[in-house]
Amino acid sequence: MVAFSAILQTALGLSAANDLTSLFGPYLSPQAEILYGNDTNFYAQLQQRWTDYKAPSYGAGAIKPATAKDVQNVVKIANANSIPFFVTGGGHGISDYHNFDGLSIDMGKFNTVERNAAGDRLTIGGAVKIHQLTKPLAEWGKELPLGSCACVGVVGATLGGGIGSLHGLRGLLVDYLEEVEVVTASGDLIKASETEHKDLFWALRGAGSNYGIVTSATYRLPEVTNKGVYVNADYVYPVSANQSFFEVLEQFDNTLPPRLAITGASFFDRVNNKPVIAVNAVFFGPLEEALPHLQPFESLQPEMKNVSSIPAEQMMDAAFFSFFGMDNGACTPNQHINIYTVALRQIHAPTFQSFYSKLVDFWNANPTYQGRLLIQRYSNEGPMAVPDDATAYAYRDVKTYMNIEGFYADSALDDAVNEFATLGRQEFVETSGFDQLAVYSNYARGDEGPVAWYGERKLPKLSALKRKWDPEQRFSVNNPVPLHWRTEL
């Protein structure tokens, strides 16, 4: 093999990427792949993005590493030649990356799933997706507070906090992370945990994309709840129920039990030309214990309903009567999806009612707009059980995650959607219970800023760790932590 130091002494710039094979090839394993932008179906060979809105460009081509050593070498060579890179795991991020043009590091080959001999620890590759874990976890009698979308990358979700329907009972996914193997900005491969590189481990758990490339992650596995049988309840209401529906959600602010997770979605039924409100409620326990908690939704006199006990591994496909197709539309790649998000400490029913009226008007005025209002209402009891300073994740007290999700094919609608959703987002911020905009960073679109992503109190430490672990800001494409925060200046 050619001496690696020879490559490190060069500084060829982005133009060096015109010949990725000669630049990177000698330092990659046989299983690694190098792709060029002019290759047939170039983008089809990469992990497909969920949305094409403000997507990155890969003018420098792409590399699909197969080993941790491959990742190290790619980072080192890219650094030495001033080639910007963008790392993709599950491909479900929605931030604005349109200003990025460089090299894609596609982690798709890091998809292993391994359980230890004792059966209480799980180690996965950096690109493993949620659907790869649902069946094994059920077979093992274990569970993790995974998200509700099957195609999301597990590690990517974890590094942003890891919310999901189980987190009221189990806490955040990040709280089950015990160790990561990570390639740092210098190209070093290290382990980070509560005992090794503890400061980096703290930062990775909440702002992880800023500090390295996780090649593998190890989680502890709790026993499954109620022998792996959960209650799934679906309800559909007419638009006339919207006021009562939002009042019910508000009443849950201080009464939502940790075993109950509520997801509300309102969309426009173009076939029948009417708005619809749908609710999926999951109760992690037996049916007889669930029914009293579901009574508020029963009292709203749904047009359709289904309440049943089903195995844990079937939960994702059972939700919402499959109104939105397989995986409820969350796994179809390259849709034009434009999302605005807000984290709420409280539900303010009048704000929801006011916005909903405007949303109905927007639907009617824009017949090709298939947007929806998504409300994820989870107890914060599980997240709050872990001290705030234990991880970089900033918003353990959030009770509701709300998205204004714009689904539409014609990008000519972008300006109208952005204007409408920006005003709507600000309306929710004013009654959110927070002093300013707060968001779950994995839902961020990119314009919210560091305080919204990571919280004012976390940023001084995060910035100090950014200077230590990534002073050249190689990992600053996605929701970047600034090198210096204003309280330090």
Swiss-Prot record:
SUPFAM superfamilies for this protein: FAD-binding/transporter-associated domain-like
Domain of life of the source: Eukaryota
UniProt keyword terms in alphabetical order: FAD, Flavoprotein, Glycoprotein, Oxidoreductase, Signal
Induction, per UniProt: Expression is positively regulated by the azaterrilone A cluster-specific transcription factor tazR.
Domain FAD-binding PCMH-type span(s) in chain numbering: 55-224
Recorded metabolic or biological pathway in which this protein acts: Secondary metabolite biosynthesis
Residues bearing attached sugar chains per UniProt: 38, 242, 306
GO MF term list: FAD binding; oxidoreductase activity
Signal sequence annotation: 1-17
Cofactor section: FAD
NAD among keywords: no
EC number of the protein: 1.-.-.-
Alphabetized InterPro entries for the sequence: BBE, FAD-bd_PCMH, FAD-bd_PCMH-like_sf, FAD-bd_PCMH_sub2, FAD-linked_Oxidoreductase, Oxid_FAD_bind_N
Function: FAD-linked oxidoreductase; part of the gene cluster that mediates the biosynthesis of azaterrilone A and other azaphilones, a class of fungal metabolites characterized by a highly oxygenated pyrano-quinone bicyclic core and exhibiting a broad range of bioactivities. The first step of the pathway begins with the non-reducing polyketide synthase tazA that assembles one acetyl-CoA starter unit, five malonyl-CoA units, and catalyzes a series of Claisen condensations, methylation, PT-mediated cyclization, and finally releases the first hexaketide precursor through the R-domain.
Family, as annotated: Belongs to the oxygen-dependent FAD-linked oxidoreductase family.
Protein name per its UniProtKB record: FAD-linked oxidoreductase tazG
Organism whose genome encodes this protein: Aspergillus terreus (strain NIH 2624 / FGSC A1156)
Gene encoding the protein: tazG
